[in-house]
Amino acid sequence: MTDAAYQACQRLAREHYENFPVASWMLPPGARPHIAAIYAFARAADDFADEGVRSPAERLALLDDWRRRLYEAASESPASGAAGESDIFVALSRTMRECRLDVRLFDDLLSAFAQDVTVTRYDTWDELLDYSRRSANPVGRLVLQVCGYRDAGLDHLSDQVCTALQLANFWQDLARDWAKGRLYVPREVFAAAPGQLRRARSAGARSNGFANATPA
């Protein structure tokens, strides 16, 4: 059953578009199924927060249930559920046990996804970087743990890389997020240079609605 669960997670990782490769061939072969399980957990949770036409209350309820199931998996008793979701937690439970993963890193991811439901703009760099600390940095630390590294220096370097990649990802998807009423550029940037927002709207991506969207 566990092998089939890992295979389902690996299929999800292969089939879902991402800006960066998932379970890359550059990773040790033994690590790839574990990375796929982590990805499947995070991908589903991110979709709860960001995709479809659910209300904010429905999104938050799904994330709360995902957190409950996370802690059940951490205690080696993954709960039953829809077939694809059960696969995720069967695989994740084994991955967490074999790789001795810190469940708090997964919880940080869920807190960031929940924040996405309720927060669409950031006033300061500190606020945006705190969000990135929870939405991106846990992934790098989990990869290190899967590969057998537990080192504060490596964690620090990984955090810097993950935050940088997260910011690059935000700004690559600026037009798409703007159309959803969300903007990952701090208000203090535009306060310091008021013309920047106007120029971004006029030069950014008229073809896909960027210029006409108006986040708060």
Locate each region found by the language model.
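Acidic catalytic motifs of isoprenoid enzymes
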Residues: 1-216
